[in-house]
């Protein structure tokens, strides 16, 4: 493992500020909008094209898959491919992109580190550097005009504006990806860009994304020995899976910043949304998360389902994860709202 990789993961293990965003992210709100977002027409146009493809193509795949299922039924293999690829890519997002790369809540071996990165890129939510930069920006400017996907306010035009319920949910779920306010990744991801292999994997986003579509198609074709099996594997394990993974992630910025309980003082509108916990692998405990961004565990009650945490816990027991950041009762009580 390279020294660059070791330095990128370096983080203090004593006196942990579990209320910060990341041990490596900017800690103060940037004051100039031009510094937070890019004013590059070429980058903005490219981002819009990618965003529209990310939204529309999986939706078309879902429609095609449902039509074929109506005509011919759906096989157990297709269901297995959907579930299996959903598990791998959503773990890549929630365990990898989110808790490991964005917030550095645990450490792991280089092989696991980069494998989670690859699985995350197969999900179809952008390269790891773009995703982490956008997420750290969201935490630093949560539910303000500089938050990229707040359902309460936005800065997509000349001036910031407050959003009503319908516009807010639409903006936070999908609309934020197709405006001109592209996050300045260099401001938020110095730790990632210092590692050459991370940069190389990030630059291979589209080949890795396509690989995530080819794998279920190949499995479907080989197991059934038919082109139809390859097609349905591509649809259910590829595009349909991508549709559900991306929309589950987007729920965290839209519904989980509008609906749910708010036991902690966070200074924003983040809420704990029970109904989204399973598809998001625990990310929808947004109020918990915004209160303690550096905690590896988001589900703080026994009934708060947190699938990504269960995997981190198992990895720790197997010796595959260490320096796992945990909350103390004092951390929790200090942030709890006074009734």
UniProtKB/Swiss-Prot annotation:
Catalytic reaction list: decanoyl-[ACP] + 4 reduced [2Fe-2S]-[ferredoxin] + 2 O2 + 4 H(+) = dec-9-ynoyl-[ACP] + 4 oxidized [2Fe-2S]-[ferredoxin] + 4 H2O; decanoyl-[ACP] + 2 reduced [2Fe-2S]-[ferredoxin] + O2 + 2 H(+) = dec-9-enoyl-[ACP] + 2 oxidized [2Fe-2S]-[ferredoxin] + 2 H2O; dec-9-enoyl-[ACP] + 2 reduced [2Fe-2S]-[ferredoxin] + O2 + 2 H(+) = dec-9-ynoyl-[ACP] + 2 oxidized [2Fe-2S]-[ferredoxin] + 2 H2O
Motif (Histidine box-1): 98-103
Membrane topology of the entry: Multi-pass membrane protein
EC number assigned by the record: 1.14.19.78
GO molecular function, one term: oxidoreductase activity, acting on paired donors, with oxidation of a pair of donors resulting in the reduction of molecular oxygen to two molecules of water
Coiled coil: none
UniProt short sequence motif Histidine box-3, positions renumbered to this chain: 286-290
Cofactor: Fe(2+)
TM regions (residue ranges): 49-69, 73-93, 109-129, 204-224, 226-246
EC primary class: oxidoreductase
Similarity annotation: Belongs to the fatty acid desaturase type 2 family.
Entry's free-text remark on domains: The histidine box domains are involved in binding the catalytic metal ions.
PANTHER family: ACYL-COA DESATURASE, BLL4393 PROTEIN
Function text: Desaturase/acetylenase likely involved in the biosynthesis of a polyyne metabolite. Efficiently catalyzes two sequential oxygen-dependent dehydrogenation reactions, the conversion of decanoic acid loaded onto the acyl carrier protein TtuC (decanoyl-TtuC) to 9-decenoyl-TtuC and the conversion of 9-decenoyl-TtuC to the alkyne-bearing product 9-decynoyl-TtuC. Shows stringent substrate specificity toward C(10) fatty acyl substrates.
Protein name as it appears in the record: Decanoyl-[acyl-carrier protein] acetylenase
Origin species: Teredinibacter turnerae (strain ATCC 39867 / T7901)
Gene: ttuB
């Amino acid at each position: 493992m390279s020294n660059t990789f070791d330095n990128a993961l370096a983080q203090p293990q004593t006196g942990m500020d579990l209320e910060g965003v990341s041990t490596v992210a900017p800690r103060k709100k940037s004051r100039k909008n031009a510094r937070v977002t890019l004013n590059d027409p070429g980058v903005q146009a490219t981002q819009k094209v990618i965003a529209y493809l990310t939204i529309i193509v999986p939706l078309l795949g879902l429609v095609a898959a449902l039509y074929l299922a109506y005509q011919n039924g759906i096989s157990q293999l297709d269901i297995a491919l959907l579930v299996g690829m959903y598990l791998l890519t959503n773990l890549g997002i929630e365990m990898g992109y989110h808790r490991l790369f964005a917030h550095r809540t645990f450490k792991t071996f280089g092989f696991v580190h980069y494998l989670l990165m690859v699985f995350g890129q197969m999900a179809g939510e952008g390269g790891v550097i773009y995703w982490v930069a956008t997420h750290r920006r969201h935490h630093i400017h949560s539910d303000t005009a500089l938050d990229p996907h707040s359902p309460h306010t936005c800065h997509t035009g000349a001036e910031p504006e407050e959003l009503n319920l319908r516009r807010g949910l639409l903006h936070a779920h999908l609309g934020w990806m197709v405006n001109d306010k592209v996050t300045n990744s260099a401001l938020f991801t110095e730790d990632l860009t210092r590692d050459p292999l991370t940069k190389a994997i990030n630059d291979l986003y589209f080949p890795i994304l396509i690989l995530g579509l080819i794998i279920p198609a190949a499995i479907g074709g080989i197991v059934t020995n038919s082109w139809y099996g390859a097609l349905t594997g591509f649809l259910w394990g590829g595009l349909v899976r991508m549709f559900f993974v991306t929309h589950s992630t987007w729920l965290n910025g839209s519904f989980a910043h509008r609906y749910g309980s708010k036991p902690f003082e966070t200074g924003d509108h983040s809420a704990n949304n029970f109904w989204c916990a399973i598809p998001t692998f625990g990310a929808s405990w947004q109020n918990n998360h915004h209160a303690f961004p550096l905690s590896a565990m988001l589900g703080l009650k026994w009934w708060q389902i947190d699938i990504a945490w269960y995997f981190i816990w198992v990895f720790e027991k197997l010796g595959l994860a260490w320096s796992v950041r945990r909350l103390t009762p004092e951390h929790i009580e200090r942030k709890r709202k006074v009734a």
